[in-house]
């Protein structure tokens, strides 16, 4: 990466927002390949070349972009040279992969300058999925209601381009993006399930979606922060998109041009917003009436300002004490922990009943068993079955695969309040492994276990990572060690969700 820093150091005064020339640089495509932005990109699948990165294709693409008008590649070009048997798809892949690197440069520079400040200490820990759960433990126990929001998708690709133009002020780059998006829409009808290559870079689509989501999030958060100035203000709407960021400090009244409904905003220091996987959570200590106002505010903001079709049914209001939130592989809810305190005053004694709210995080066992059933580890009732597709592998390979899945699930679900569901998942994987090995050796499970014993499955029962750490800190038999094993542990090294955990 250091050898490319010279190229990426753009002139802050004149060239910071002009990214189009970078599309003609070979090192951009090398970055897309080396950093694995899309592993199916820029790989040759033709005869004699194998799966190797080809700088020759990159050079020819750059020459064609220099010589041809607006990157127009005719459909007849694929018949001109057998070396480019699917060059239309390959060119689209390469352009989208390179553009995915280029368009992130302004954001990367801002992130580097921001993370170097004192306010972001150990920013790498914030990348972990588990980092959000300690925050929920501290905040959700004091809140009453939660809005479960299903974020709508843009109905037109032009909306994605328009959202990006406030960050990338290079018209040529935006025209290239617009051209690539429309070419993708024209070519995707020719894609068949048998083709193993993807026309467009999913990382670029994810970047465009997040940029679009940041647009309405910035408006929502700004209105939230300015709500103290609007506590007694009833008004219509005013939001001019182009000059919005320049008018933030002057915005006192908020009104809509498209409809005449009044908007009431109230100061609420106990409101938290989280967006994840196309969904969002808005938790607050407000009453149900005020939460209902926030609900229709979201719907109106999407429909009348961002031109995204949305209905009130996509935003559900739930009470935290009566509702379990399906959030990142956990069922989270707020429950009461009753306790009794005996107090003695002189000759009189009395008992004080006290109840504390705590965040309860449980494993969605039904959904997780459904994922294991789809992966052919068990049936729909949760009874373990053999994995016939793995029966051709060696015994050690089969055991390693099952142990790896078991440890990954245990690692991710280490924050569960109840470990019994996790033990059931381990049981399913353990006996699925035994049945797979018995199927391979054409034996019954009973005879297989009797012949080899259970020593080969000891990896399922070896101490977990947290147990090993605690055993180094506390002596064996320490009275809190057993309690620590049962407690919740959140890891700051988990940056992706296991495929089985993501059961949606």
Curated annotation (Swiss-Prot):
Plastid as a keyword of this entry, yes or no, is: yes
Where is this protein localized, as stated in its record?
Answer: Plastid, Chloroplast
Q: Which GO terms describe its cellular component?
A: chloroplast
Q: List the disulfide bonds.
A: none
Supply the InterPro entries for this chain: Domain_X (IPR024937), Maturase_MatK (IPR002866), Maturase_MatK_N (IPR024942)
Keywords of the record? Chloroplast, mRNA processing, Plastid, RNA-binding, tRNA processing
Q: Report the record's Gene Ontology biological process terms.
A: mRNA processing; RNA splicing; tRNA processing
Q: Name one GO molecular function term.
A: RNA binding
Q: Which Pfam families match?
A: Intron_maturas2 (PF01348), MatK_N (PF01824)
HAMAP family to which the protein is assigned, alphabetical = MatK
Q: What does this protein do?
A: Usually encoded in the trnK tRNA gene intron. Probably assists in splicing its own and other chloroplast group II introns.
Give the record's family classification. Answer: Belongs to the intron maturase 2 family. MatK subfamily.
Q: What protein is this chain from?
A: Maturase K
Provenance organism: Pentaplaris doroteae
